[in-house]
Every structure is written in structure tokens, then in C-alpha cells.
Amino acid sequence: MVSITKLFGSYGSNCKLDSFNDEMKFFAKMSILDWCGVAYAAKKEPVSKIVSEMVKEENGINQARVISTGDKVSSRGAALANGATGHALDYDDTHFLFVGHPTSSALPAALALGEELGSSMEDILLAYMAGVEVSTRIGHILGYSHYNAGFHQTATSGSFGSTIVASKLLNLNEDQTINALGLVSTRASGIKSQFGTMGKPFHAGMAASNGIEAAKLSKLGFVSREDGIECEQGFFLTHGWDKKIP
């Protein structure tokens, strides 16, 4: 089998903004606008308040802003809280190849880490688009067999997308990006039994936070498997994949 981890790690490390045509950029901006609207509308939802309060209590560093409260917390904390807020009303964008909501994890990671790093809007847009591309393709490979086994692609595939987002913004090289994907393969989680509870929107925040964590650890030298997605007992083979690559 082709190394999926290396394939997407290489793509994420090397893609440029001009890799995407104008139509793709237009729809990316519409998805960003959509997410901002639904996140703002949900900032007083109970799940938004609870998660935002938790990250505020844990806060020891002011890196990125929480939508629900306006407080500045760590970028991981902001990604967690804002991801949950953006998915709280469940009106965020949907991709049916992905079988989930790709923006709800990729964009909170991009905005939080981008704020911490002082990234340009062009860099944030590129990171977001690259992350959505990877999470959607991984979600498409996993397909409905993964979803029908009880997994929530917004959380699982979304974790890989947010890892690409964070890797781009942190300027990780190809090997570091591959390593980050390998690491997040053991973090990506989220089960459909949480649907109908606060656990479902929390999945989006988990995925956003997972990506920042994996990329930052990889940048510091943390070592994981370079085939963590597709290896024996890796992510694909333990998460309902039907062994088909579309």
C-alpha cells in the first residue's frame, strides 16, 4: 500500500496558496464566513460556556481569543473552546465525501494558532485550505464503513486536517509534518453515541486542539510512526476502514 501518512504529509508541507484555483478559494472563504456566523450565534450555548470556562480556569498564557467569553488563553485552549462553539448549533458546513464538517476543526486551529504566531491572513487561508483538503480526502478514504462503525469523521478525520493546519503555520518540514500526522493518529477519536449531547460539538474542538498539539510536539522533536495512519494496527485498520481507496 502507498504510505498515506507520507503522501498527505508531503502534500501538506509543500502545497502553496496558488495550488488552489479561484473557485476553491471562493468556497473556502464562504465556509469561513459561514463558520464565523454560526460560532457567533452559538457563543452563549451551554457547551460554549462550559468549555470556555474550563480553558479559562486552566489558562496560564495569553495566546488566542475565545469567542464565547473574549478571554485570551493558550492556542490549544482557544481551538478547543472555539471548535466546540462553532459546531454547537450544527449548522456549519458539511462535505458528504468527508461525511462530516471539515471547517469546524480546521478553522479554529488556524485562527487560534495564527493569532498566537501573528500569521498573515494569506498564511491562515492556506493552512485552512490545506487542512480541509487532507481531512476531506482521509474522510473519503475511510468512507461510510468508518461512520457506520460508530465513528464521527468531524472528530477523527478532522484531527488529521487540523494537524496539517498547524504544521503549515508552524513551518514544519516534510518529515516533521509526517511525524505529526503519525502522532495524531493515536489521538484522533470521537464516537457517534455522543450525538444529541454536548459531546458532539466537543468533538470539533478536540480535533482542532489535537492538531495543534501534534504539530507543536513534532516541532520540539517528539517522534512517532511515519506510517501511523495505514500501518498494521494503525488508524485505518482499527477504525472501521473497509480497505478500499476510492
Feature roles, as predicted:
Residues 1-246:
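N-terminal core-entry segment
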